[in-house]
Amino acid sequence: MLHNIDLNKMNQLMKENKDAKQIISQLLENHHTAVSTIAHEIRNPLTLVSSALQVMEIQHPEVKDFSHWSQMHEDVDFMCSLLNELSSFNNSDSLHYSVFSIGQLLKNIAVSFAISLDEHDNHIEFSSDIAPDLHNFTGDKIKLEEVLLNILKNAQEAIPTDTLHGSIHMKAEQITDMLIIKITDNGCGISADHLESIFEPFTTYKQNGTGLGLSLSKRIIEAHGGTISVNSVPGKETLFTLRLPM
């Protein structure tokens, strides 16, 4: 898997040398093709395994009493999630541009996320402050929504279930030609050691995490010409800041 620092070096080399640009472009194309092929080849038998488990449950309900049955389901679900995120990561810098109301998108995300909290985590209060004068945005609407929902979901998971007053806040404003989105939570926080590598692929500090969510988010934001950063005080709060050129 190519890391962000590798991509930065390659982009610089491609600008300086036309021959290198052609060679690197071909290597990147082969890299994307290889990852897609591997994911596809693994997904097919994994789908068969998942289907077989479902059939076994229907025909032999007693298998649910097997001590490791639920773990088998969790392992298959984890592999499916990993393949989905791997495919998304592989295509994260391929954007489908359109012009849309970023303000309306943020409002829709806020409503959807608030509803999901009401259903599952009523100990968490969610609030949003979206500036009413945001300009239209040109970018990949679906992938930006994916980034924001991923960060909001991480914030949700960072707040322990025994917290009496969990809080998540999303703020969006436009300063000159820059869109700034901040997402804050009062969850467990992230240690300084973990902050250094949190955007690296396959880096995760939570159970059943794939380690691709934040790395994928970073690649999508950077593909839009923006930046994403994080600040955290362990045991107090975490702040993710997204900056996107309008």
Language-model segments: which ranges?
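Short conserved segment of the HATPase_c
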Residues: 190-201
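Short alpha-helical Gxxx[C/S/T] motif in the catalytic ATP-binding
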Residues: 213, 217
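Conserved DHp (HisKA) dimerization/phosphotransfer helix of two-component histidine kinases, i.e.
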Residues: 66-116
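Conserved catalytic submotifs in the C-terminal HATPase_c
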Residues: 109, 123-135
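Conserved HAMP-HisKA connector
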Residues: 15-39, 50
